[in-house]
Amino acid sequence: MARVTVEDCLDKVENRFLLVMLASKRVKQLYKGARPLVDPKNNRLVVTSLREIAAGKVGYEMIKRQRTQQ
């Protein structure tokens, strides 16, 4: 993958807003020392996180909150 595009990532994530949230959380993990799941190739952390998402190495799980009755 020479360049990672938004379209590459949108195959794995439902919408652009969710993609931004997922990528930013992964960048924070990488910044704190998490090991990259793809070859970083001296890229910035943002590019590495997008490459991981496009490769299907990073995903998400939606959690629905249940309403509490008052």
UniProtKB/Swiss-Prot annotation:
Reactions accelerated catalytically: RNA(n) + a ribonucleoside 5'-triphosphate = RNA(n+1) + diphosphate
Gene Ontology terms describing biological process: DNA-templated transcription
GO molecular function: DNA binding; DNA-directed RNA polymerase activity
InterPro entries per the UniProt record, alphabetical: DNA-dir_RNA_pol_omega, Pol_omega/Rpo6/RPB6, RPB6/omega-like_sf
Signal peptide (UniProt feature, chain positions): none
SMART domains referenced in this protein's UniProt entry, alphabetically: RNA_pol_Rpb6 (SM01409)
EC primary class: transferase
Keywords assigned by UniProt, alphabetized: DNA-directed RNA polymerase, Nucleotidyltransferase, Transcription, Transferase
Gene3D superfamilies assigned: 3.90.940.10
Any single Gene Ontology cellular-component annotation: DNA-directed RNA polymerase complex
EC number: 2.7.7.6
Cited NCBIfam families: rpoZ
Similarity section: Belongs to the RNA polymerase subunit omega family.
Function: Promotes RNA polymerase assembly. Latches the N- and C-terminal regions of the beta' subunit thereby facilitating its interaction with the beta and alpha subunits.
Assembly, per entry: The RNAP catalytic core consists of 2 alpha, 1 beta, 1 beta' and 1 omega subunit. When a sigma factor is associated with the core the holoenzyme is formed, which can initiate transcription.
Name this polypeptide is given: DNA-directed RNA polymerase subunit omega
Species name: Pelobacter propionicus (strain DSM 2379 / NBRC 103807 / OttBd1)
Gene from which this protein is expressed: rpoZ
